[in-house]
């Protein structure tokens, strides 16, 4: 395996042809099963690790095995770097962004990547404030196996915040009873601010089935504290909001600090809101 690529894949070559390999790491020696169909006229192939012969020091046992390689009992997707240690994940992202800045933008720059507060202690889990699933033929919440329409029933979602998991348990989501094929969405604002409170979400959550509210509230209250100022937002349960529990704080704080830095030495300024 030669180098990092996109979508949690790495680059290798077979008979001179590029192969994008899932669940690999640079400098590893692995056995790969190629995705079908493929033929020798293809510009590149894709495949997945089925055996690791010489592992990288950044390789770990997947914390969520169901999202790991299919040959190792996984295959549902949703956690592309589940086989990579937390420091290795930061290295992967920093190198990938730096390479793209150089290749596409012709800018050579170091890209610092930092974890949000609480991420390390949680082992990289429990950060999603929204999850989406599909009901299988038995009405159980499930996820599709990667690259197929096959549905794999799940009884938890390790990437979801603990607050969301508490709501899912309280609303009996994991017990099933859904119409087969229905789309299930949980939106649970994580209490935000300088100190994150993991208390119960009261009715500030939504369980939606095929876009219709089943439990909670259609309008959710999101709260973000930036540099000591708290902002409240009303967001539709079907609407967009940053998925990571700390992303709005990090993004908002960074932008405000950049703007303040420009304004401090300027008589006037134009700020573009994209």
Stretches found by the model and what they are:
Residues 1-274:
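Accessory RNA-recognition modules of RNA-modification enzymes
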């Amino acid at each position: 395996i030669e180098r990092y690529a996109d979508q949690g894949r790495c680059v290798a070559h077979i008979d001179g042809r590029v192969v994008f390999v899932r669940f690999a790491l640079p400098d590893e020696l692995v056995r790969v099963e190629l995705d079908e169909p493929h033929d020798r006229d293809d510009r590149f192939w894709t495949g997945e690790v089925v055996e690791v012969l010489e592992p990288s020091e950044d390789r770990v046992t997947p914390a969520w095995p169901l999202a790991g390689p299919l040959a190792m009992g996984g295959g549902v997707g949703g956690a592309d770097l589940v086989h990579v240690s937390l420091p290795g994940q930061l290295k992967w992202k920093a190198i990938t962004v730096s390479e793209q800045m150089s290749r596409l933008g012709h800018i050579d720059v170091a890209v610092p990547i930092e974890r949000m507060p609480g991420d390390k202690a949680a082992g990289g889990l429990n950060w999603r404030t929204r999850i989406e699933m599909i009901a299988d033929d038995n009405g159980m919440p499930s996820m599709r196996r990667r690259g197929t329409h096959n549905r794999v029933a799940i009884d938890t979602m390790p990437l979801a915040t603990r607050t969301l998991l508490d709501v899912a348990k309280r609303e009996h989501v994991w017990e099933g009873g859904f119409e087969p094929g229905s789309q299930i969405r949980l939106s649970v604002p994580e209490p935000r601010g300088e100190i994150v409170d993991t208390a119960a979400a009261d009715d500030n959550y939504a369980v939606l089935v095929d876009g219709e509210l089943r439990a909670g509230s259609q309008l959710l209250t999101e709260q973000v504290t930036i540099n000591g100022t708290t902002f409240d937002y009303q967001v539709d349960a079907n609407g967009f909001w940053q998925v990571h529990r700390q992303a709005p704080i990090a993004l908002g704080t960074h932008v405000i600090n950049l703007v303040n830095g420009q304004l401090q030495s300027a008589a006037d300024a134009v700020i573009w809101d994209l």
